[in-house]
């Protein structure tokens, strides 16, 4: 099995992105699966294009994208990507699309095809907080979540099955210095361990487990 793991460069005035720092520290193999690491730009269009180029080069079985979400306190496993770019801030090249589709005439949304509940349970069993998230936002993270899912759906229809998904991670402790009190953070060591456990769950579970992971609202 080949798993392509992507992480963004810093954005929004930050000097570091925990997603990129995390993928740098992942081992090259987890439970026999080859781990391919890719830095991607926090740029509409170019982020997905760079992933697509690597997919065509490596033909991975899975693409797992990692992104920073400064308001999250745990390892947040996304359930769905939606076909909308509605950017509150510009990307790293100044693009700020508002109410534009990620893919013109594409489906309204894609559910991710990774075993999200198995991932959450595996991470929590490792003493690391984790949960299902039902929104990846409307910035670059959702753009990538949806865009890669669209690529995966097309490849699967062509007889080249590929799964994809997205995980949001918190700020690192050094990033919250000077930010409002109680801004959540997580150590890089814990994030890396959480992502390693997530990948183990992907390798071990071809289909998802049946446990509750929903929310009332």
UniProtKB/Swiss-Prot annotation:
Compartments, as annotated in UniProt: Cytoplasm
Catalytic reaction equation(s): Release of an N-terminal pyroglutamyl group from a polypeptide, the second amino acid generally not being Pro
Major localization class: cytoplasm
EC number: 3.4.19.3
Covalent S-S links between cysteines: none
InterPro entries in UniProt: Peptidase_C15 (IPR000816), Peptidase_C15-like (IPR016125), Peptidase_C15-like_sf (IPR036440), PGP-I_bact-type (IPR029762), PGPEP1_Cys_AS (IPR033694), PGPEP1_Glu_AS (IPR033693)
GO CC annotation: cytosol
Broad EC category: hydrolase
Molecular functions per Gene Ontology: pyroglutamyl-peptidase activity
Keyword Ubl conjugation recorded: no
Signal peptide extent: none
Catalytic residues (positions): 78, 141, 168
Keywords noted in UniProt: Cytoplasm, Hydrolase, Protease, Thiol protease
GO terms, biological process: proteolysis
Source species, domain of life: Bacteria
Complexes and interactors: Homotetramer.
Family from the record: Belongs to the peptidase C15 family.
Purpose: Removes 5-oxoproline from various penultimate amino acid residues except L-proline.
Entry protein name: Pyrrolidone-carboxylate peptidase
Record gene name: pcp
